[in-house]
Design a protein with these regions (language model features):
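C-terminal binding/interaction regions
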Residues: 1-79, 84-117
Length: 117
């Protein structure tokens, strides 16, 4: 069986030691699709959903970037990294589904896949 990086030789959870890795440019792109029911798609105006509390997708973009910056606080064993860039976009396709893309970049010893997701 292949070694699982977050389990040590004593079968205990551990954070991966990245101290000996070189600092390199890291990039991750995550994409998700959210399909809405008709009663929601009928509320789309100019590519967003207007609500009493403001534009839903714009608020989601802000919250998504905030979450990417705090990934290490939310997922055990993620390394704290200072993102160099986090670009989050939400676009509607012809059927009214939201296509969500997040691209994260950093120069670090570890990747940014979890932050992008």
């Amino acid at each position: 069986m292949k070694n699982i990086t977050h389990i040590n030789k004593d079968n205990k959870p551990q954070m991966v030691d990245v101290s000996k890795k070189r600092i390199t440019a890291r990039y991750a792109h995550a994409q998700s699709t959210v399909v809405f029911p008709k009663e929601i798609t009928s509320r789309f105006v100019n590519g967003d959903i207007a609500s009493a509390k403001g534009p839903v997708f714009s608020t989601a973009i802000i919250a998504g970037v905030m979450a990417a910056k705090k990934t290490y606080e939310l997922i055990p064993f993620c390394h704290p990294i200072g993102l160099d860039d986090c670009e989050l976009n939400i676009n509607l396709d012809e059927a009214g589904a939201a296509i969500i893309n997040c691209i994260c970049k950093v120069e670090h010893r570890t990747g940014v896949e979890m932050e992008a997701m």
